[in-house]
Amino acid sequence: MLTLASKLKRDDGLKGSRASATASDSTRRVSVRDRLLVKEVAELEANLPCTCKVHFPDPNKLHCFQLTVTPDEGYYQGGKFQFETEVPDAYNMVPPKVKCLTRIWHPNITETGEICLSLLREHSIDGTGWAPTRTLKDVVWGLNSLFTDLLNFDDPLNIEAAEHHLRDKEDFRNKVEDYIKRYAR
């Protein structure tokens, strides 16, 4: 991360002296997305929920990172859930793409990793979807909340998990605990 931040600062310093050739300038250009991410990643790391950790496999690629959520309450307490986030070039006009890498029994996350979280929707009829004013911090806090206050059995993506909870809450809890033991340690 520091590498990209240092590069951006160096590039800003070079803007004043445009003596270099245009071909050389094009190699120094940094996308709007990457400029936003330098600021947003610093804000995210300063305001990360205590149940979350962020990892950047390549510190020069702030647009690809992994999030680990370790809930400290509720059905999913004791589990460790991995999410992969990719921020597209058109960010912040479009939301990041997020996938859950940990198999989970959850009404708002499918077993294949698709996630139902309104702020990850590019278009939303209720106004809760993605907007350019949202940031990575909002995404991380939203994903973290899927394990507590945003856990929603009334508007599920994994209908089978939601119906299971409606039918038999204790058996639902047992299946969640089984998934945690098998996939989320």
Curated annotation (Swiss-Prot):
GO terms for molecular function: ATP binding; NEDD8 conjugating enzyme activity; NEDD8 ligase activity; NEDD8 transferase activity. It comes from Bos taurus. This is NEDD8-conjugating enzyme UBE2F. It catalyses: [E1 NEDD8-activating enzyme]-S-[NEDD8 protein]-yl-L-cysteine + [E2 NEDD8-conjugating enzyme]-L-cysteine = [E1 NEDD8-activating enzyme]-L-cysteine + [E2 NEDD8-conjugating enzyme]-S-[NEDD8-protein]-yl-L-cysteine. The modification N-acetylmethionine is found at residue 1. It is an enzyme of class 2 (transferase). GO terms for biological process: protein neddylation. Gene3D superfamilies: Ubiquitin Conjugating Enzyme. InterPro entries: Ub_conjugating_enzyme, UBQ-conjugat_E2_core, UBQ-conjugating_AS, UBQ-conjugating_enzyme/RWD. Accepts the ubiquitin-like protein NEDD8 from the UBA3-NAE1 E1 complex and catalyzes its covalent attachment to other proteins. Together with the E3 ubiquitin ligase RNF7/RBX2, specifically neddylates cullin-5 (CUL5). Does not neddylate CUL1, CUL2, CUL3, CUL4A or CUL4B. Mediates neddylation of the CUL9-RBX1 complex. The acetylation of Met-1 increases affinity for DCUN1D3 by about 2 orders of magnitude and is crucial for NEDD8 transfer to cullins. It comes from the Eukaryota. The active site is at residue 116. Residues 1-29 are annotated as: Interaction with UBA3. Pathway: Protein modification; protein neddylation. One of its GO terms (cellular component) is nucleus. It holds the Pfam family UQ_con. Residues 32-185 form the UBC core domain. The keyword Acetylation applies. Belongs to the ubiquitin-conjugating enzyme family. UBE2F subfamily. Transmembrane segments: none annotated. Keywords: Acetylation, ATP-binding, Nucleotide-binding, Transferase, Ubl conjugation pathway. Signal peptide: none annotated. Its EC number is 2.3.2.34. Interacts with UBA3 and RBX2. Interacts (N-terminally acetylated form) with (via DCUN1 domain) DCUN1D1, DCUN1D2, DCUN1D3, DCUN1D4 and DCUN1D5. CDD domains: UBCc_UBE2F_UBE2M.
